[in-house]
């Protein structure tokens, strides 16, 4: 619990700080504990607030609305939460925008102010500092001439008066100046948390918006040298600077864990605790001018705009944040948004902030989008009615009038806000090096990706690619459904187009997809698949009540009270032992009401409960019990269906009712094991425990239960032959998560009479799911290879073998294969192909033909002198031939080479009995030249000579071996023995020592490495032989490329004998049960400073023969 409060406090640090200051100015004290409790409740019932919420009056009212809805659903909302919410709402109302301002005539008629009666007896000073304890509803106050302005000013600005040591000097109302450019008259100062003395209404005053204003002494005026500042600058407003608005940045929980709050707020809070009040000041501040400067006699003192640069701490934090997380990471966006809205940034500040934190390429992007945004904003300013006098020079901080800091410090608030919006938008468009902004159409949710992560990616891409806010919102809402995975789409579909107008669509989607794809959701699906109980109501709150116990959260069929009663009744019934054998089956000591047998002790089928009505089977699912009784004569399987249906006709009669006269007999098919299916899986075969053969003269038809089809479970229809003697199985697929327990009835087997058509004597071959007379389940197919596709056809009872020719219009029979007694005639048309046939005949009759799969067709073939028969498109079309081209895994050339080397399809080349084990032999082709041919095979390469190393010192370097866990020590011993057998290392007594360790690869194998940092420090470096890659522009186009992978190249290059002892290492024994073993490398060790240079030297020597025969070549290694 303490950790949760600490997290809430750190996450909402800026909100808590602002609320405390705001309420303190209104005379209301709220403990931090109550505020933390308030934000805990808000996070619980308003999941959208951490991502999208701000301290805006509209959002705060929405929070109250959703808390009320949660209270109506039975959730307990503490009374202190309601009180704190109402107080903060009353304090936030003065910050509403001008469009939402409330006129006095619209305000409530009176405000209820309950003040303590004891305040009337205290002194005037105490009276001025006391405030109301309860505030019912915020009231819009209007000033009259009876208002005590001094007391009113003390209520709003107590700290200011304490610092000055005197009361405020209020300026009287001015009717000559327009409202937009004049300070707010003192009589129109709004009050939300009012003092003891109530303010009376004056209905003659115009409506006033809720705003706080600083004391009258701090009125803004330009420097005295010019009445309107610099040339071209409009008159600066002389009103009071508004009170700082509440934080509008959204909290983002994806910020780094160690820095939940903003860096800026951490600095500000730390400075406040140390008594440094300058931490709150803006870069451009308003300071009172000395007496006599700028203010004329009889006028209130004026202030002068002065610029103060950023602190090094802020710039450093921005630079580190961009470097570590990226310019557009959630953490950096939050930090930048806090700085932008917490300071009065001029164009010079934005340029310094970007230059100090971004890379040159990123700064170029920022500057480009800044200029682009300025051009768009200037067009809007000119098109406004009336036009706004803010030009491009002012927004960019350039030109004769706005190039200096002192000139930019005098910019209007409207210009500052436009610069802020343009620069924030330009910052969002910055792309990281090497990354491109994807299209929002390509942002799709992964199968295991949480829905909020997908929406966050979609919003980020849409924000970068779509400038219009309304269009961006529509696109995000559309793609949030279209590009979601099927599970989330199923959850969102009921909400699509039905979200209330006042609710946020994305927030409702996020709440609907809460938990999908997580561990809880997977556990729910598995539990649902195993138990068959729908668990949706246990995950989300169930709106209805149980009809059995009246509690909320479950249905009557899942009621724990009812289940407990059933268990009690069952235990009471089964507690007594039956006195004798079961009167129903006569083969077990159990009660007749609990008998589940289908056959009696003689093997005869049982039916009915011998109690009432027509004979009925006991309450048992499936055609047979889960563990059926096997009568004598049936070893290890259930009775054949032929005997089962024979017994059905011999059932006893009850109540003198004749058995139903039906032509079709049926049996229920059930599962004999637990079955679980998930969407997307291929059809599965489910055993039923029922075996053939069927009764003679019948055929079986398997049909699924309609109740399962309505749920999305499909039992595929299949046919069972009468002579099939195997187990009957069901083919099932499902579009929803589904499960079945052993014994559940899921299908029916219908016995239909088999009627032979005509006098056909074709033998029927038994098989499940087909009555195909030929017993074939696949058609003829041929794979394109070196061999020609040849198939056989029967024409008029005579078999012909021919080539499948999809380019031939007609079929052709070779003249030497045409029977002489078959009539033929001279063809009217000729045959044109690769060549032209001289003698062409055609059959005088239309012949009957059977294809390779007994497809019946007719043909009138052409006859000519060709070496083999051709089956043209006239026959192929009647046979239903198709040409398919699946994407091969390997090209035909690669498959041919791999087949010669022992490739086994489906397994590949390797060591584990799936291909050739011996290495490739170097075969020399005497007819060609090039890499791998005679000049390389016949060339004699001298054995490599070791290259000695140059040492800075001969003083031994010894670094102790650090401890390793047991698993790594065991792997280290095995690798050392392997290297010792290969001759790469040898025993050592050297005074040098370096630590050794092992790492595990992705394949699971271990790799031994030596930490040679201390040894490398005393080695004289050689420098690389090939420091860089050649320029691609100088390489001729389409040059041949060969890649040679030298496995363990370092281990084939020897070390100089005098250098081996310097690469010694120690392998400790497990648990120090024996002395450690020491070795030293005889070959180039990995990690040595000069190993790459020596390796390049040896590879260059090995490729020397290539250089002789191929002078123009590039070698990269």
UniProtKB/Swiss-Prot annotation:
Domain Reverse transcriptase, residue spans: 58-195
Catalyzed reactions per annotation: Processing at the authentic HIV-1 PR recognition site and release of the mature p17 matrix and the p24 capsid protein, as a result of the cleavage of the -SQNY-|-PIVQ- cleavage site; DNA(n) + a 2'-deoxyribonucleoside 5'-triphosphate = DNA(n+1) + diphosphate; Endonucleolytic cleavage to 5'-phosphomonoester
SUPFAM superfamilies: Acid proteases (SSF50630), DNA/RNA polymerases (SSF56672), dUTPase-like (SSF51283), Retroviral matrix proteins (SSF47836), Retrovirus capsid dimerization domain-like (SSF47353), Retrovirus capsid protein, N-terminal core domain (SSF47943), Retrovirus zinc finger-like domains (SSF57756)
Recorded GO MF terms: aspartic-type endopeptidase activity; DNA-directed DNA polymerase activity; RNA binding; RNA-directed DNA polymerase activity; RNA-DNA hybrid ribonuclease activity; structural molecule activity; zinc ion binding
Residue stretches making up the G-patch domain: 890-936
Lipidation feature positions (N-myristoyl glycine): 2
Region entry Disordered, spans: 165-264, 598-629
Pro residues bias locations: 232-247
Pfam families in the cross-refs: dUTPase, G-patch, Gag_p10, Gag_p24, Gag_p24_C, RVP, RVT_1, zf-CCHC
Entry annotated with the keyword Secreted: no
UniProt domain Peptidase A2: residue ranges: 800-875
Biased composition (Polar residues): 604-622
Keywords, ordered alphabetically: Cell membrane, ERV, Hydrolase, Lipoprotein, Membrane, Metal-binding, Multifunctional enzyme, Myristate, Nucleotidyltransferase, Protease, Repeat, RNA-binding, RNA-directed DNA polymerase, Transferase, Transposable element, Zinc, Zinc-finger
Record localization: Cell membrane
Residues at the active site: 805
Domain of life per record: Eukaryota
Post-translational modifications reported in the UniProt record: Myristoylation is essential for retroviral assembly. Alteration of the glycine residue leads to a block in the budding of particles and an accumulation of Gag inside the cell. Specific enzymatic cleavages may yield mature proteins.
This enzyme's EC code(s): 3.4.23.50, 2.7.7.49, 2.7.7.7, 3.1.26.4
GO biological process: proteolysis; viral translational frameshifting
Gene Ontology cellular-component terms listed: plasma membrane
Location, primary (coarse class): membrane
PANTHER family: ENDOGENOUS RETROVIRUS GROUP K MEMBER 24 GAG POLYPROTEIN-RELATED
Function, as annotated: The products of the Gag polyproteins of infectious retroviruses perform highly complex orchestrated tasks during the assembly, budding, maturation, and infection stages of the viral replication cycle. During viral assembly, the proteins form membrane associations and self-associations that ultimately result in budding of an immature virion from the infected cell. Gag precursors also function during viral assembly to selectively bind and package two plus strands of genomic RNA. Endogenous Gag proteins may have kept, lost or modified their original function during evolution. Early post-infection, the reverse transcriptase converts the viral RNA genome into double-stranded viral DNA. The RNase H domain of the reverse transcriptase performs two functions. It degrades the RNA template and specifically removes the RNA primer from the RNA/DNA hybrid. Following nuclear import, the integrase catalyzes the insertion of the linear, double-stranded viral DNA into the host cell chromosome. Endogenous Pol proteins may have kept, lost or modified their original function during evolution.
Protein family (similarity comment): Belongs to the beta type-B retroviral polymerase family. HERV class-II K(HML-2) pol subfamily.
Protein name (database record): Endogenous retrovirus group K member 9 Pol protein
Source species of the chain: Homo sapiens (Human)
């Amino acid at each position: 619990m303490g950790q949760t409060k600490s997290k809430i406090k750190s996450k909402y640090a800026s909100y808590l700080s602002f609320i405390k200051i705001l309420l303190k100015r209104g005379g209301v004290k709220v403990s931090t504990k109550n505020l933390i409790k308030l934000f805990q409740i808000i996070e619980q019932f308003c999941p959208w607030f951490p991502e999208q919420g701000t301290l805006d009056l509209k959002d705060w009212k929405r929070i109250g609305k959703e808390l009320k809805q949660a209270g109506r659903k039975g959730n307990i909302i503490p009374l202190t939460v309601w009180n704190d919410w109402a107080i903060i709402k009353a304090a936030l109302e003065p910050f509403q925008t001008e469009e939402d301002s409330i006129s006095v005539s619209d305000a409530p008629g009176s405000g209820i102010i309950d003040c303590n009666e004891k305040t009337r007896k205290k002194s005037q000073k105490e009276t001025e500092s006391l405030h109301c304890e309860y505030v019912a509803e915020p009231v819009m106050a209007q000033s009259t001439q009876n208002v005590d302005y001094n007391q009113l000013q003390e209520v709003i600005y107590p700290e200011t008066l304490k610092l000055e040591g005197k009361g405020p000097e209020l300026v009287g109302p001015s009717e000559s100046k327009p409202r937009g450019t004049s300070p707010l008259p003192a009589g129109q100062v709004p009050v939300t948390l009012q003092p003891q003395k109530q303010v009376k209404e004056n209905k003659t005053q115009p409506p006033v918006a809720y705003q706080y204003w600083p004391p009258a002494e701090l009125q803004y005026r330009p420097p005295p040298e010019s009445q309107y500042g610099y040339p071209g600058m409009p008159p600066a407003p002389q009103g009071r600077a508004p009170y700082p608005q509440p934080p509008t940045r959204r909290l983002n929980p994806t910020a780094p864990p160690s820095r939940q709050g903003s860096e800026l707020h951490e600095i500000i809070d730390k400075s406040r605790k140390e008594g440094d009040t300058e931490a709150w000041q803006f870069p451009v501040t308003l300071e009172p001018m000395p007496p006599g400067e700028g203010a004329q006699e009889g006028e209130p003192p004026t202030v002068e705009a002065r610029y103060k640069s950023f602190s090094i701490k802020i710039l450093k934090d921005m630079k580190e944040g961009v470097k570590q997380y990226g310019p557009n990471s959630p953490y950096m966006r939050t930090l930048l948004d806090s700085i932008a809205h917490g300071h009065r940034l001029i164009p010079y500040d934005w340029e310094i902030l970007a230059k100090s934190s971004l890379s040159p390429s990123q700064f170029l992007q920022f500057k480009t989008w800044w200029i682009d945004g300025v051009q768009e904003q200037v067009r809007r300013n000119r098109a406004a009615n009336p036009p706004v006098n803010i030009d491009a020079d002012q927004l960019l901080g350039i030109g004769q009038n706005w190039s200096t800091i002192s000139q930019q410090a005098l910019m209007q608030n409207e210009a500052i806000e436009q610069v802020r919006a343009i620069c924030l938008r330009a910052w969002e468009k910055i792309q990281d090096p090497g990354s491109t902004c994807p299209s929002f159409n390509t942002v799709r949710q992964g199968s295991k990706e949480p829905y909020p992560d997908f929406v966050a990616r979609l919003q980020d891409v849409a924000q970068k690619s779509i400038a219009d806010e309304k269009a961006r919102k529509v696109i995000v809402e559309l793609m949030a459904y279209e590009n979601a995975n099927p599970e989330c789409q199923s959850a969102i579909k009921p909400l699509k187009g039905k979200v209330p107008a006042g609710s946020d669509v994305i927030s409702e989607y996020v709440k609907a997809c809460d938990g999908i794809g997580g561990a809880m959701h997977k556990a729910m699906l598995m539990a649902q698949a195993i138990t068959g109980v729908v668990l949706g109501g246990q995950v989300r709150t169930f709106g209805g009540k149980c009809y059995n116990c009246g509690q909320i959260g479950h249905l009557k069929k899942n009621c724990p009270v009812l289940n407990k009663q059933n268990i009690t009744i069952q235990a009471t019934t089964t507690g007594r032992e039956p006195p004798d054998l079961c009167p129903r089956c006569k083969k077990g000591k159990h009660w007749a009401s609990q008998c589940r047998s289908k056959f009696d002790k003689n093997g005869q089928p049982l039916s009915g409960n011998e109690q009432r009505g027509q004979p009925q089977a006991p309450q048992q699912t499936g055609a047979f019990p889960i563990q059926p009784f096997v009568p004598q004569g049936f070893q290890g399987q259930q009775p054949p269906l032929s005997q089962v249906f024979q017994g059905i006709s011999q059932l006893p009669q009850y109540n003198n009712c004749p058995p139903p006269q039906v032509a079709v007999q049926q049996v229920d098919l059930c599962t004999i094991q637990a079955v679980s299916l998930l969407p997307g899986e291929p059809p599965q075969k489910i055993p039923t425990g029922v075996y053939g053969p069927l009764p003679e003269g019948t055929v079986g038809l398997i049909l699924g239960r309609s109740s399962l089809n309505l749920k999305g479970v499909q039992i595929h229809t299949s046919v069972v032959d009468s002579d099939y003697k195997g187990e009957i199985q069901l083919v099932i697929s499902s579009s929803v998560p589904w499960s079945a327990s052993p014994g559940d009835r899921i299908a029916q087997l219908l016995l239909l009479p088999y009627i032979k058509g005509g006098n056909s004597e074709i033998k029927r071959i038994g098989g499940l799911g087909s009555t195909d007379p030929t017993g074939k389940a696949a058609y003829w197919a041929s794979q394109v290879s070196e061999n020609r596709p040849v198939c056989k056809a029967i024409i008029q009872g005579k078999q012909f073998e021919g080539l499948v020719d999809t380019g031939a219009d007609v079929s052709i029979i070779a003249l030497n294969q045409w029977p002489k007694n078959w009539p033929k005639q001279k063809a009217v048309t000729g045959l044109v192909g690769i060549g032209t046939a001289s003698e062409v005949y055609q059959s005088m009759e239309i012949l009957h033909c059977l294809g390779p799969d007994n497809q019946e067709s007719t043909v009138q073939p052409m006859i000519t002198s060709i070496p083999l028969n051709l089956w043209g498109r006239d026959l192929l079309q009647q046979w239903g031939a198709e040409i398919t081209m699946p994407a091969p895994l390997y090209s035909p050339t690669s498959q041919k080479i791999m087949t010669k080397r022992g490739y086994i399809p489906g397994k590949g080349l390797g060591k584990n009995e799936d291909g050739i084990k011996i290495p490739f032999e170097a075969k020399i082709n005497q007819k060609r030249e090039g890499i791998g041919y005679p000049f390389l095979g016949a060339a004699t390469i001298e054995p490599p000579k070791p290259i000695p190393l140059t040492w800075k010192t001969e003083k031994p370097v010894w670094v102790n071996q650090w401890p390793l866990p047991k698993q790594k020590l065991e792997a280290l011993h095995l690798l050392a023995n392997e290297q010792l057998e290969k001759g790469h290392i040898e025993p050592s007594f050297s005074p040098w020592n370096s630590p050794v360790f092992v790492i595990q690869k992705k394949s699971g194998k271990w790799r031994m490495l030596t930490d040679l940092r201390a040894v490398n420090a005393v080695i004289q470096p050689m420098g690389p032989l090939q420091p860089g890659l050649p320029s691609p522009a100088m390489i001729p186009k389409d040059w041949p490329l060969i890649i040679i992978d030298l496995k363990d190249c370092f281990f084939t290059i020897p070390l100089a004998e005098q250098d081996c002892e310097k690469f010694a290492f120690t392998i400790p024994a497990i648990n120090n049960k024996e002395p450690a073993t020491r070795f030293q490398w005889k070959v180039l060790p990995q990690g040595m400073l000069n190993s790459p240079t020596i390796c390049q030297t040896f590879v260059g020597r090995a490729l020397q023969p290539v250089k002789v025969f191929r002078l123009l070549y590039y070698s990269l290694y």
